[in-house]
């Protein structure tokens, strides 16, 4: 649930940043334009980091499953040898 809230917050920040950037362009306010661009870019970075974390977690879960399968195979092999 926290991840979903984080993704929502990132999307909201991206939209707000894009709006500030557009406002800065329309009003020729370079500060507002850069602020918006920075906010939008930071939201993208957070979203990509969240994706990378999800990928790492998924990879770790797959590795754990493979290790468990390996232990089960070894256990079965030693049980048959007795």
From Swiss-Prot:
It comes from Enterococcus faecalis (strain ATCC 700802 / V583). It comes from the Bacteria. Residues 1-36 have a biased composition (Basic and acidic residues). Coiled coil: none annotated. This is UPF0337 protein EF_1180. InterPro entries: CsbD, YjbJ_sf. Residues 1-39 are annotated as: Disordered. The lineage of its organism: Bacteria, Bacillati, Bacillota, Bacilli, Lactobacillales. Pfam families: CsbD. Belongs to the UPF0337 (CsbD) family.
């Amino acid at each position: 649930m926290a991840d979903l809230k984080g993704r929502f917050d990132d999307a909201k920040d991206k939209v707000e940043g894009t709006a500030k950037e557009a406002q800065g362009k329309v009003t020729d306010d370079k500060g507002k334009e850069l602020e918006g661009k920075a906010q939008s870019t930071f939201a993208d970075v957070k979203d990509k980091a969240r994706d990378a974390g999800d990928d790492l977690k998924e990879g770790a879960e797959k590795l754990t499953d493979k290790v468990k399968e390996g232990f089960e195979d070894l256990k079965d092999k030693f049980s048959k040898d007795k």
